[in-house]
Amino acid sequence: MAKVQLSPKEITLFRTALKCYETKQYKKGLKAIEPLLERHPEHGESLAIKGILLHSLGNTKEGYDNVRLGLRNDVGSGVCWHIFGLISRADKDYVQAAKCYINAHKLEKNNSSLLRDLALLQSQLRQYKALADTRNALLQDNPGVRANWSALAVAQFLRGEYASAYKIVDAFESTINQGVPVDTQEESEAMLFMNLVILKKDGVEDAYKHLLSIEKKVLDRVAFLETRAEYELYLSKMEEAKSTIYLLLDRNPDNHQYYYNLQRAYGYEDASGKVLDSAEWLNLYSQLAKRYPKSECPTRLPLEKLEGDEFLTHVDLYLRKKLKRGIPSVFVDVKSLYKDTKKCKVVEDLVSKYASSLSTTNKFSEDDDNSQIEIPTTLLWTYYFLAQHFDHVGELEKAEKYVDLAIDHTPTLVELFMTKARISKHKGELQTAMEIMDHARKLDLQDRFINGKCAKYMLRNDENELAAKTVSLFTRNEAVGGAVGDLADMQCLWYMLEDGKSFARQKKFALALKRFSTVFKIFDTWADDQFDFHFFAFRKGSLRTYLDLMSWEDSVYDDPSFREAAQGSIEIYFALFDLPFAKYSPKLPDFEKLSSGEINEEEEKKIYKKLKKDLSKRLERAEKLKEADKSRAKSEDGMPVKYDEDPLGENLVATSEPLKEAQKCLEKLLPYGDKNPSAYILAAQLYTRLKNFDTASKYLEQAKVILGQNDPTVISTEKFYNSIKTQSN
């Protein structure tokens, strides 16, 4: 097709529309482009501009149609390809966007902004080889900008080409040595990055020498000292390591790792953590306690390794000090010692004696002199400790006894009722636990933590509406979606997860999927948030932080909250596939009747009629909620009003392909299957339902390797697999 030639007036209209897009005046931009398209309805670039304006106004399908039509009419236009890339990028389709930018750059080789955007996409997609080529092209275009050198060096580092990364950083550093002005913060970060490159390229010894040579240039003293201490320990330069670690402790005497490293530097502990000289080791901590009197570490850390009478002596002093001061978190502090059952018993006997003596003599021990009389609250915190202790070890009757004694002593302390509620929860008394936690909440209505804890107990008791009403005391209830919508905006993972699990227990699958999908969106947002940093990090010179970010983002979905939401969703999709009536979200009694298969046809018809009626009511309610959200949503100039199209999740549960949806959830779990073998179990169950028995068998075998042949989930999945396979044959 011959390319349309625009008149000067038409070119002005085109530029006006483009300017309107850049300034977010989308409706005005459409008015500018329409007259041009009336005269030239097949002008590709104008169609593409119209498409991106419509897309920006929320008309996604029409926007894509116009862009694709424009591209078809003018496939040789870099503008059309660029616009297609922009809308693909806006919709998080980074693979398609990268292809579009590559095509656009082929047609506009002098457009460096295309290369910059392409580099961001390649970083997001972890296409490191292609990224290195793109960063190199940007460097050739503008070698005077430090960010271009840094970006190329990092790209080479990420693809494992450490020698190339070193050459690039070294080449730029040589220009600085010739008198080129430099930002000291950027230079400091570049030096530490270069040291990391040398470590990967040449090993610890060369990295240590380089680190010492750049000491005066490094502004991040903590990073410098930590790295130096690490190298000195590795190279067995123990005297130097001691000096370095003491400098770190002087800065932060509450960092546990510094103490562990100091033990190694003195030779009192090996790399595995085993104490080699207990007397000298204990003396070291005694000296450290005098040197850092405000830090708890020198008195707390020895408790991890001490045994027998020495442990008894030191834990006695430690607990007395904490209970005297009335520190509520003392049990949380010491419960890690309970991994050793002997230490657990020592602590139990010791604190039980405290309680007995304090209740009669106001002293920790009857052998203490009269100058050691304790204030009344010491007994309170001792009872509180014992309540938590016995709850932790599963002796719930004793736990309840001590928490009641504490409440009798001080009936207005919130923490006591929280512990009493937890004990009731562990006894399986969810209603009682919820009521006690609500009483605790009412003792301090200004405390957001106890409000959230109470809501959590309500959700565990399947009181969803009451929980939402409770958290609404601390949310913006005028937000779209009300209190729950505001919690979603605040990325409140725990609430969405607990709410979803509660709805799943009640077989309200639509709402359960809705909450789990909110969890997915939060994690997707975190994954997408890195996009801007692919540019920003190099502008600021934060190279090491950027590498940490990339490492964290690589495992962003390896998170317990995401795992629970994904597994919950997959199990619901399995139910939707296995039980067609599940899409109606029947109440538990009806769900059990229908799934039992023991009801007659007439009763089944009655239940289905009721389910359809309930569904109709829910759909009406969903429409009302959408209208309410529309009235609450504020429209920005030229921007579409944002509200939830599916507030109750009915669209999610109505899917015609539940196994396909389950597969989408599973794809993000499987990369971490070795750490989370339940992903392999779910995969085996999914592919069994799909009758892809070879794949199902593969995942079942992987689960067996990790969990063992006798694991209950392995056994049940294997039975399910064999049953379906037999039926298929």
Swiss-Prot record:
Compartment(s): Cytoplasm
Domain of life (superkingdom): Eukaryota
Residue ranges, compositional bias (Basic and acidic residues): 626-645
Cross-referenced InterPro entries: NatA_aux_su, TPR-like_helical_dom_sf, TPR_rpt
GO terms, molecular function: acetyltransferase activator activity
Main location: cytoplasm
Region (Disordered): 626-646
Keywords assigned: Coiled coil, Cytoplasm, Repeat, TPR repeat
One biological process term in Gene Ontology: protein maturation
Function: Non-catalytic component of the NatA N-terminal acetyltransferase, which catalyzes acetylation of proteins beginning with Met-Ser, Met-Gly and Met-Ala. N-acetylation plays a role in normal eukaryotic translation and processing, protect against proteolytic degradation and protein turnover. nat1 anchors ard1 and nat5 to the ribosome and may present the N termini of nascent polypeptides for acetylation.
The protein's name in its UniProt record: N-terminal acetyltransferase A complex subunit nat1
Annotated source species: Schizosaccharomyces pombe (strain 972 / ATCC 24843) (Fission yeast)
Biological classification of the source: Eukaryota, Fungi, Dikarya, Ascomycota, Taphrinomycotina
